[in-house]
Amino acid sequence: MHLEERVAIAAPPAAVFEAVSDWEAQSEWVAFTTVTVEPGGHRVGERLTAVTRLAGVGFADPMEVTRWEPPHRVDVRHLGRVVRGTGTLTVEPAPGGAWFAWAEDLDLPLGAVGRLGFAVIRPAFTLMLRRSLRKLARQVESRPRPRPGGTGRVR
């Protein structure tokens, strides 16, 4: 099952990549989710866990970074019982900033039952992801950035 959402962000691609790959800070903009990272820095092999919880029900989504290409792309492999597959975060330059895309290629559990279940929740999941990406864009756009010309002052 493939799912992908994109958002335009009025910030340099490097700033967008820095924000989306700050795993623990994803807890601030990914709806209903808290992310923890095992020590090791940003690199292939790094492990992290996202716990998503809504109305007291939740699941853990352990992941491993499988591709690390700053400031453009990072891939993770989902290793959990509920979520398995590949997530891809990409940042592309755009006029006035960058495009950020979050794609998931997931192997749904429980065969036909899992596919049917996801078909039911997909609209809500998509809405949650879109809102999360808009929140990310607002956060990144509101961060002070150095002025062009190297003055060190922020705008």
Residue ranges with predicted function:
Residues 145-155:
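Actinobacteria-biased recognition of intrinsically disordered, low-complexity terminal regions
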Residues 2-4, 58-62, 83-88:
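Short, surface-exposed coil-to-beta transition loops
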Residues 77-131, 147:
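Beta-strand/loop substructures that line and gate deep hydrophobic ligand-binding cavities in soluble
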Residues 59-66, 74-77:
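Helix-adjacent hinge/juxtasegments
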Residues 10-14, 41-42, 66-71, 90-99:
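A short, structured loop/turn motif at beta-sheet edges
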Residues 53-59, 108-112:
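Short, cysteine-centered beta-strand-loop-beta hairpins and adjacent loop/turn segments enriched
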Residues 46-53, 74-80:
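Short beta-strand segments that buttress and anchor functional surface loops
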Residues 1-43, 138, 153-155:
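Hydrophobic ligand-binding cavity/cleft-lining segments
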